[in-house]
């Protein structure tokens, strides 16, 4: 537990606490008790609080909680479940500061003698609502069964890249992207099929197929992977890519707060460090 002094936009300074100090840059709002000793609740809509480090304006919400009478709570909706639910109720912003981190194993174990190249990539989770199946690809020449995934070109959004990759890898063209996860995954591995180490930021988008409209796949793509429709209940056994398994386990029905370990991001001097290492300090 870490304590801060928070300045409100009316000049009043109040004490506040943060359950996990390493999440300070993920704070997007502040909660004050209904029976607080600082402000008139009728004025809350006209007030903001100042982030103790960045100086950003934070929304203030009032909760019927006696524990908040003398000390406010800093809210981190992306990483604390109770705060995530408050964010849904009060329309608070989410800011990810811990990225789930995946490191290559087996043939994709990092090669210390090879340079690492950064890449933005996308995981596209596409559903056929008629039979509750999901569009996947199976690579016959290597052990790789996954959702559709691929790199994001410099000028593309994750949504645009997903639609392009779906067309190239499966031939399907009548697809709608319906949502993008608030989370980015980090994947550090040796891309044995490319001969380079990669550090990828993985964006996750979800969508649906509208029809069976397809275009002919190139012969090169046919050799690399085959499209398959997999039932929801069979995805756990089908998927072999660990970060895809994470998506299937946690994000299929909507985002939830990520409470686990990972690489710090959007956190200035803490960026690139493991959360678990910071918690031990």
Feature-to-residue mapping (PLM):
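Entry beta-strands of beta-propeller and related beta-repeat scaffolds
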Residues: 133-134
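Acidic, metal-coordinating catalytic segment for phosphate/diphosphate chemistry
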Residues: 101-125, 129
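Unchanged
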Residues: 152-179, 184-242
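Nudix hydrolase/Nudix homology domain
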Residues: 143-144, 214, 218-281
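Short hydrophobic/aromatic beta-strand or adjacent loop that forms the aromatic wall/cage
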Residues: 3, 44, 119-123, 200-204
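Active-site beta-strand termini and strand-to-loop segments that position acidic
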Residues: 7-9, 50-53, 126-129, 139, ...
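NTP-handling and nucleic-acid-processing catalytic cores
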Residues: 1-98
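A short gly/proline-enriched turn/hairpin at secondary-structure junctions
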Residues: 146-150
């Amino acid at each position: 537990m870490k304590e801060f002094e928070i300045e409100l936009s009316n000049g009043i300074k109040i004490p506040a606490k943060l359950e996990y100090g390493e999440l300070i840059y993920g704070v997007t709002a502040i909660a004050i008790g209904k029976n607080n000793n600082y402000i008139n609740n009728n004025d809350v809509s006209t007030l903001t609080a100042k982030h103790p480090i960045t100086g950003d304006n934070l929304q203030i919400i009032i909760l019927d909680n006696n524990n908040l009478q003398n000390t406010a709570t800093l809210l981190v909706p992306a990483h604390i479940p109770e705060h995530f639910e408050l964010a849904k109720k009060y329309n608070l912003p989410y800011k990810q500061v811990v990225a789930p981190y995946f490191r290559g194993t087996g043939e994709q174990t990092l090669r210390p003698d090879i340079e690492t190249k950064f890449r933005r990539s996308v995981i596209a989770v596409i559903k056929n609502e008629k039979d509750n199946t999901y569009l996947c690809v199976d690579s016959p020449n290597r052990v790789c069964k996954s959702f559709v995934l691929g790199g994001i070109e410099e000028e593309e959004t994750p949504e645009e890249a997903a639609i392009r990759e779906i067309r190239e890898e499966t031939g399907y063209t009548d697809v709608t992207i319906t949502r993008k996860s608030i989370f980015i995954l980090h994947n550090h591995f040796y891309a044995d099929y490319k001969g380079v180490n990669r550090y990828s930021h993985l964006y996750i988008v979800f969508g649906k197929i509208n029809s069976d409209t397809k275009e002919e796949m190139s012969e090169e793509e046919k050799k690399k992977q085959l499209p398959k429709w997999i039932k929801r209940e069979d995805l756990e056994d089908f998927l072999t890519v660990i970060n895809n398994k994470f998506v299937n386990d946690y994000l299929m029905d909507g985002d939830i707060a990520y409470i686990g370990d990972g690489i710090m991001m959007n956190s200035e001097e803490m960026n690139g460090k493991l959360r678990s290492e910071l918690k031990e300090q």
